[in-house]
Curated annotation (Swiss-Prot):
Belongs to the XseA family. The gene is xseA. This is Exodeoxyribonuclease 7 large subunit. GO terms for biological process: DNA catabolic process. The lineage of its organism: Bacteria, Bacillati, Bacillota, Bacilli, Bacillales. NCBIfam families: xseA (TIGR00237).
Amino acid sequence: MEKQYLTVTALTRYIKTKIEYDPHLQSVWLKGEISNFKNHSRGHMYFTLKDENARIAAVMFAGHNRNIKFRPENGMKVLVKGKISVYEASGSYQIYIQDMQPDGIGNLHLAYEQLKVRLEEEGLFSQVYKKTIPPYAKTIGVITSPTGAAIRDIITTIKRRYPIGNVIVFPVLVQGESAAPSIVQAIRTANEMEEIDVLIVGRGGGSIEELWAFNEEMVARAIFKSEIPIISAVGHETDFTIADFVADLRAPTPTAAAELAAPNIIELQEKVLQRTLRLQRAMRELVHKKEEKLQVLQKSYAFRYPRQVYEQKEEQLDRALEQLVLAKERYIDKKVNQLKQLSFYLEKHHPSQKIMQTKVAVETLQKQLQREMQTLLQAKEFAFVRAAQKLEALSPLKVMMRGYGLVYDEEKQVLKSVKDVSLGDAVSVQLQDGILDCSVSGIEERELNNGK
């Protein structure tokens, strides 16, 4: 019988079919530690689940992981639910996760702690960014449920404490999946209204699930970006949400938030009364001091004898005028003398004198330069004539005029000895008026005088 060979693809698909038709592998509850975690740009999560002895590849698609509240990280222990299948391209089996929870700690609690740490590292909780709550807000915005007890407590408290204040309510959902976007939109709408001085954002008490909208990152960032100061009032005094950390001021309850946002009009009236009394007291004291000063002035010599004081001052004025006239004359005399001295100095040091002196000096130097140049030129001309005469005396042409000539070999080199030629060599003889081409037909060597 001929053997049937399977392709790798066929075998892999067969194994995949076997696994996917196994009911025990289509609903698997698994716990392990996350490693090699990667969050794809399309939202899918890829990682490995492992324990001490084994590991399995894991995939959680975006459609499932968008519902988890915490952020998976390497080293985190988790509980997952999913199904086992085979990834044909690599031939490896892996778990496709449908739900994931942290192992040993609540899902929402872990998400809360992770977001709290991350936003704190970004500086969203820093006191540097906290805005001051206005002490006398004219218009107070309230972002909460329109039907809960919180809105009734807030409005009742504001109207009781500050009946002249305005309240604008922004009704929102305070729990459920749509609550966070609803709160964010209300904060943005309030910031577009110029008349609002302060915002209260909150709701009544509840479980962590019911309060979760105020732990959402989008709500925290909307509070941080708000130009209007925000007072958070979420739950009871023991409840702390992310919104409380980001807000400019945290109130333990909605009623307390209303008390922080709205001043007590009775206390304000008491302050106005106290300041009015202090102002009246200060005015009375000022009037009393002025009256005492007036009485002193009325008893003074100037007030009792104004004519004598006038005459004395008139005499002082006359003397002052005389001194002023004398001082003016002395000042003018002094300036006239200074002007004369400056005129004399200027005349003595007038530039025309220096220009004349410089002109004479330049003319003298010019004449001297001309004389020296003439002398130098004559000396150079005399030296040139003598040098020309010496050069002419040494010129070969002078020698040739006395009957001498220069003999050259075929290479136009001057012959200095009969030893430089041989019989039959062609030579040239240069005379003063031309050149003779000759041939050596005989050589007669002579001894030079003095043995040279």
